[in-house]
């Protein structure tokens, strides 16, 4: 997945949701958006993950793919925290929707005994951000931790 393929289309949208995980593609897209559009009125919702936080990283999972996923989400969360402070007086808004385990194809076979969020619950948090008249730095949605 080459994020550069999306760059030329971003200007046309006022609302952008970065949800797909492919290594650092979310980070690259977000960085591009901030660099090019920080003075434009846009709402960017980034779906991160509690796996990218110290408190919810699951140390029991040995899979390298999970560790890699968590590492990229952690980097993304740190960037969002930093950039939100810089953008506080700018028209560009960045929202971090940080769900715990979501019942999707990606989580099948993992955390089989844990309560999982439904995708609709995450989409309601996204909707809240899009409709919000104020800035929301991070929404953490949890059932597990």
Task: Label each residue range with its predicted role.
Residues 1-12, 25:
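Conserved Rossmann-fold cofactor-binding substructure of NAD(P)-dependent oxidoreductases
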Residues 20-30, 43, 126:
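Conserved internal alpha-helix within the Rossmann fold of NAD(P)-dependent oxidoreductases
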Residues 19-21, 38, 42-88, 98-104:
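Catalytic loop of short-chain dehydrogenase/reductase
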Residues 27-29, 56-59, 107-109:
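Conserved catalytic-core motifs of eukaryotic protein kinase domains, centered on the activation segment
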Residues 30-34, 77-83, 123-126:
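Short-chain dehydrogenase/reductase
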Residues 1-4, 31-42:
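Eukaryote-skewed repeat-based solenoidal scaffolds used as protein-protein interaction platforms
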């Amino acid at each position: 997945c080459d994020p550069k393929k999306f760059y030329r289309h971003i200007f046309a949208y006022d609302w952008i949701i970065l949800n797909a995980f492919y290594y650092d593609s979310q980070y690259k897209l977000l960085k591009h958006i901030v660099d090019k559009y920080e003075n434009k009125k846009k709402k960017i919702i980034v779906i991160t993950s509690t796996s990218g936080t110290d408190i919810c990283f699951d140390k029991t999972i040995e899979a390298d793919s999970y560790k890699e996923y968590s590492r990229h989400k952690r980097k993304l969360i740190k960037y969002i925290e930093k950039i939100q402070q810089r953008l506080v007086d700018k028209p560009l808004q960045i929202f971090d929707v940080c769900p715990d385990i979501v019942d999707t194809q990606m989580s099948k076979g993992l955390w089989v005994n844990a309560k999982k969020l439904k995708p609709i619950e995450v989409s309601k948090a996204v909707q809240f951000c899009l409709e919000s008249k104020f800035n929301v730095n991070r929404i953490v949605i949890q059932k597990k931790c």
